[in-house]
């Protein structure tokens, strides 16, 4: 078996390379390449490990013909075109926990630096001045910290602030009341936070919803003299508006570790009193660099070797422990999706994926992704579990997941139903021995079949002699039957045949089969 090939294109702790090799990957460390130089070699690799220097653009992704996964050693993925990667079927991962403590500590450090004006006091003292009265600070004890974003890093900042006897008010649309109580913070809307906070710290990703969340308008709503810290992403604060707010005294101080444009060689904020800047140092500790390197290597190798998906940004996470359990279900789901995609006629409007029995106890997202991957092959031959949901969304397909804990005739069941302009079509399958996918129902007719290779699907009137005539036709044309599976509604009614054949059935043979007495539908299938 060929080993997966991984490229490390940014400076990274040597432990990353060591882990890749220990886990069965071939790895090259090639740093400092221009985008054009990187484009010349990226097509050789299955995996790519980067930090913030490499920019994985749409153009570069187009040249990554074999790339299956990219891992960002760190949290921010501004340097990766995730939509382009998703359409290409490339999994995008980050390592959100490796530098969480480091970043949280940097935010707390900047808060203290603002409270006591430490950088300016240091510069003044080293200039031979002794300006004790000029640098009067404030205590943080008893003050209110406004937390914009209460995820992993935000929750660590909250914990440290509570240890300093501060009050913490948090704004986060995903923060539940129960989680707020658990964290010991007050959940609030943004306007309430702006009005109450003595210090504001941001810990949220940059999205269309959060861009300029501290806009000119919102800065005007803050408590007079508020101090603001941003160790999250540039673009969360309107920097020109922040400059004006500092000049007017509405904002008493600001400390930014991140900027709208980086490297920040120029900014309207530079030179402003009560402003502190650091060059994106949030993750810059020895411990964090080792942690993110280890984590990105573990995550990428798990995916390339075992199929485990951890901290993916464009597909459901799937641990290396879950992967072996889900793999047969995903194989079943993909074949069911492929079957219904090949047989359904008309425009697809909706798809329902139902899991029953043992399947209902598993993570449904990989099963859904596999169904869509099989289904969407009618549109694209490069589809996989990563890009299938995006392709489905592009086409306006309504995707629904339904879980039934009950156990029916089969201990586990996956059912796929599509609604088209010509009616609903449904297929269902199970696992034999928990590992072997089997079709057990097609369009309401019970049938047991293994979906594999080249197959022939026939709907006919159930009548004596038909099977013999069909066998003769195939034999005369050199088509060898591997397996033969039959289902019917009632004796003498409609019957369904699924035959596996050793080679693809030519179009002229399909046309001859269509002319056999009693035949309603003939369709060649491929899995």
Q: What would you call each of these model-derived segments?
A:
Residues 104-123, 143, 159-166, 294-307, ...:
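Oxidoreductase and adenylate-handling cofactor-binding alpha/beta cores
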Residues 30-31, 51, 73-74, 89-101, ...:
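Short beta->alpha connector loops at strand-helix junctions that form conserved
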Residues 317-319, 324-360, 364-527:
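A conserved regulatory-domain signal marking ACT and ACT-like small-molecule sensing domains
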Residues 88, 96-144, 148, 156-159, ...:
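Phosphate-binding beta-alpha-beta segment of Rossmann-like dinucleotide-binding domains, i.e.
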Residues 14, 133-224:
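Rossmann-like dinucleotide/phosphate-binding beta-alpha-beta segment
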Residues 88, 92-93, 216, 225-343, ...:
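Rossmann-like dinucleotide-binding domain for NAD(H)/NADP(H)
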Residues 1-93, 215-217:
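An N-terminal-biased, well-structured beta-alpha scaffold segment characteristic
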């Amino acid at each position: 078996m060929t080993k997966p090939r991984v490229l490390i294109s940014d400076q990274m702790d040597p432990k990353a390379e060591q882990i890749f090799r220990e886990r069965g990957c071939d790895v090259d460390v090639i740093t400092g390449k221009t985008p054009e130089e990187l484009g010349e070699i990226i097509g050789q690799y299955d995996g790519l490990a980067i930090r913030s220097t490499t920019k994985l653009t749409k153009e570069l992704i187009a040249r990554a013909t074999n790339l299956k996964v990219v891992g960002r050693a760190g949290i921010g993925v501004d340097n990766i075109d995730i939509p382009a990667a998703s359409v290409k079927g490339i999994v995008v991962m980050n390592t959100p926990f490796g530098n969480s403590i480091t970043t949280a500590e940097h935010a707390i450090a900047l808060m203290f630096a603002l409270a006591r004006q430490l950088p300016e006091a240091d510069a003044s003292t080293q200039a031979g001045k002794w300006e004790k009265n000029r640098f009067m600070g404030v205590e943080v004890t008893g003050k209110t910290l406004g937390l914009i974003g209460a995820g992993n890093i935000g929750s660590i900042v909250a914990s440290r602030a509570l240890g300093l006897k501060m009050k913490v008010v948090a704004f986060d649309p995903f923060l539940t009341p129960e989680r707020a109580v658990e964290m010991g913070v007050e959940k609030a809307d943004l306007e309430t936070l702006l009005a109450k906070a003595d210090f504001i710290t941001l810990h949220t990703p940059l999205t269309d919803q959060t861009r300029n969340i501290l806009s000119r308008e919102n800065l005007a709503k803050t408590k007079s003299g508020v101090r603001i810290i941003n160790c999250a992403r540039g673009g969360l604060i309107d920097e020109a508006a922040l400059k004006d707010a500092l000049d007017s005294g509405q904002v008493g101080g600001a400390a930014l570790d991140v900027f709208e444009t980086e490297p920040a060689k120029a900014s309207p904020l530079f030179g402003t009193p009560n402003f502190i800047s650091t060059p994106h140092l949030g993750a810059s500790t020895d411990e964090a660099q080792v942690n993110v390197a280890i984590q990105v290597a573990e995550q990428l190798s798990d995916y390339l070797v075992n199929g485990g998906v951890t901290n993916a940004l464009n597909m459901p996470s799937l641990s290396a422990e879950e992967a072996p359990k889900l793999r047969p279900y995903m194989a079943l789901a993909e074949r069911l999706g492929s079957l219904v995609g090949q047989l359904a006629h008309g425009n697809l409007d909706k798809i329902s994926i139902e899991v029953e029995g043992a399947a209902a106890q598993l993570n449904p997202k990989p099963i859904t992704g596999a169904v869509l991957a099989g289904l969407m092959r009618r549109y694209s031959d490069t589809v996989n579990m990563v890009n299938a949901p995006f392709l489905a969304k592009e086409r306006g397909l309504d995707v629904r997941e339904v879980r039934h804990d009950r156990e029916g005739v089969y201990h586990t069941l996956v059912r796929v139903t599509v609604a088209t302009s010509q009616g609903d079509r449904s297929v269902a399958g199970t696992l034999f021995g928990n590992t072997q996918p089997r079709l057990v129902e097609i369009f309401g007719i019970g049938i047991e079949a293994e979906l594999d290779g080249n197959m022939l699907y026939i709907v006919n009137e159930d009548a004596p002699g038909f099977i013999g005539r069909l066998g003769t036709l195939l034999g005369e044309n050199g088509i060898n039957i591997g397996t033969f599976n039959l289902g019917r509604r009632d004796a003498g009614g409609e019957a369904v045949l699924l035959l596996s054949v050793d080679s693809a059935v030519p179009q002229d043979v399909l046309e001859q089969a269509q002319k056999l007495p009693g035949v309603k539908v003939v369709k060649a299938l491929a899995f």
